[in-house]
Amino acid sequence: RGQQLVSALTPGITVPADASLLGKAVGNLLSNASRYSPEGAEIRVWCGRLEGRPALSVENTGARISGDALPHLFEAFYREEGSRNRSTGGSGLGLYLVKMILDRHGAVCTIENTEEGVKATVRF
């Protein structure tokens, strides 16, 4: 799809976690960023500290989410109306599972529109 992954990772950031589960959560965020971005879009991954605590973010460019949909994104089977098409697929369970995994790790994920796209931020 010609998308570019750009990362800014702070060395030495660790969290006590089930690496497999946490990998699934982060993988889902990355997959969504790619799936809902156009060809040639930039996907940005950041890892560092926010307010002294470990955090990471995944941000896409070129795609946004309606304000009405934002509060519902982590609900099971929820899909924003515009995302229901054959090219994106999905069951509406991905972000729900992300939330369940992060809850288990004492982490919180927020999703917001930015000037360029959508950013998911995970705070541990």
Predicted regions and their residues:
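Conserved catalytic submotifs in the C-terminal HATPase_c
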Residues: 4-13, 50
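A residue-level detector for a conserved hydrophobic packing site
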Residues: 22-23
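Short helix-loop "hinge" at the ATP-lid/N-box region of the Bergerat-fold HATPase_c
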Residues: 33-34
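Short beta-strand/loop element within the Bergerat-fold HATPase_c
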Residues: 40-52
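Short conserved segment of the HATPase_c
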Residues: 53, 65-77
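Short alpha-helical Gxxx[C/S/T] motif in the catalytic ATP-binding
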Residues: 89, 94, 98
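Conserved glycine-rich
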Residues: 106-107
